[in-house]
Structures are given as C-alpha cells and as structure tokens.
Amino acid sequence: MSAAEKIALYWAYPFVRYALVVGVLIALCASLLGVTLVLKRFSFIGDGLSHVAFGAMAVAAVLGLHNDMPLILGITVVCAILLLRTGQHAKIKGDAAIAMISVGALAIGYLLMNLFSTSSNLSGDVCSTLFGSTSILTLTETEVGLCVALSALVLLTFILFYNKIFAVTFDENFAKAVGIKVKFYNLLIAVMIAVVIVLAMNLVGSLLISALV
C-alpha cells in the first residue's frame, strides 16, 4: 500500500475528519481572541475560564443533565463577564482574580465529582474531561455542526466589529471619547471567549485550552 493510499484510508474515518474540522475552527477563533485578551492584560483568562467550565461540567454531572452545554456555557459566560467588567476596577486585579476563580472552580468540580459521581471509573472521567483524551474519538455529527455554527458566528462577529474591538482593546478612554459603547464590546468579547472555551473542551479538554487562547 502506497503512502497516498494509507493517507486516504486514514481520512476515511469520520472521527479524523471531525477532529480536523473542529480543531481548525477552534484554533482560528482562539488565535484571534487571544491577541485581544493579551493586549487587555487578561492573558490567563482562558486558563481560568476552562477551570470554571470544568466546575460547571461537574455540577451538570451531579444534576444528571444529559445536555450539559447550556449550563456550562451560561456559567462560563457569566464568569467571563464578571472578570472582564470588574477585573480592572476591583481591589483584586485581573490575573489575581482569575487565579482565585481558576483554583476554586477546579477544586469544587473535583470535589463534586468525588462526592456525587455514579461512575465506576472516576479517574478516567476526570482525565478525559481535563485533557480531552477520549472526546476526540467520540465527536458526533451534531457536535461538529454546532461547533461549525458557533465558530462561524464568533468569526463573523469579530470581523464585523473589528474596528470597535480594536479601539476598546488598545485604549478604552479613547473609545469612550469617540462614542463607542465600551461596556457592550467588553461584554461581546467575554461572550465570544466563553463560547470558544466551551467548544474547545470537547476536543482538547479543560486544562489544555490555555495553550490555544
């Protein structure tokens, strides 16, 4: 069998195609938003929100929810908004607040999974959640479709509002002076980064998202 035939055989498996599509879309969204977050001095927000998402996933598991996406996305979006809106003005500044939320959410998530989990393989469940070790192989067509739709929405939003996001990122005072709604665009950035993090959990796990964002 030639190399070309081996490659063709490899790509014949649906999970390989699904992983490629989802991985490329998530990497593209994360790279665009990552630059914005670094310039806003929130470079560790990806790591913090990924741990928040892990805690939310543990809560969903305890509640026995079959579709945990709405709960995880909702909690992650709320935390992202709180961090971006209060991190610059609170007594505890950005990175310190992120570190506190990150450690707290991770500890609460693992505690809940230990106390209330009905799984016989808790360590395996935690490992796959943190590192995405099995999620790559189990992506369904529905999950891929959802990822494509949400990634396209994030990219389209970023492109349409790029100039205003650029202004808010570099100088919020200037943005306010020229009439840009700074609070709204900070909210928009928070929602977009939360969406990307929740989507990425299915592929790379909650711990490795910080390498992308």
Region roles according to the model:
Residues 24, 28, 32, 74-82, ...:
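Generic alpha-helical transmembrane segments of integral inner-membrane proteins
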Residues 6, 102-159:
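Transmembrane helix-bundle core of multi-pass membrane transporters
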Residues 35-120:
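Short loop segments and helix-boundary regions at transmembrane helix junctions
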Residues 10-19, 64-70, 91-97, 135-146:
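Interfacial loop-to-helix junctions that mark the boundaries of transmembrane helices
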Residues 23-27, 45-53, 73-77, 182-192, ...:
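Short hydrophobic alpha-helical membrane-embedded segments
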Residues 20-24, 69-74, 96-100, 144-149, ...:
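Hydrophobic alpha-helical transmembrane segments
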Residues 1-28:
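Membrane-interfacial amphipathic/re-entrant helices at transmembrane-helix boundaries
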Residues 139-213:
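Helix-loop-helix "hairpin" substructures at the membrane interface of multi-pass membrane proteins
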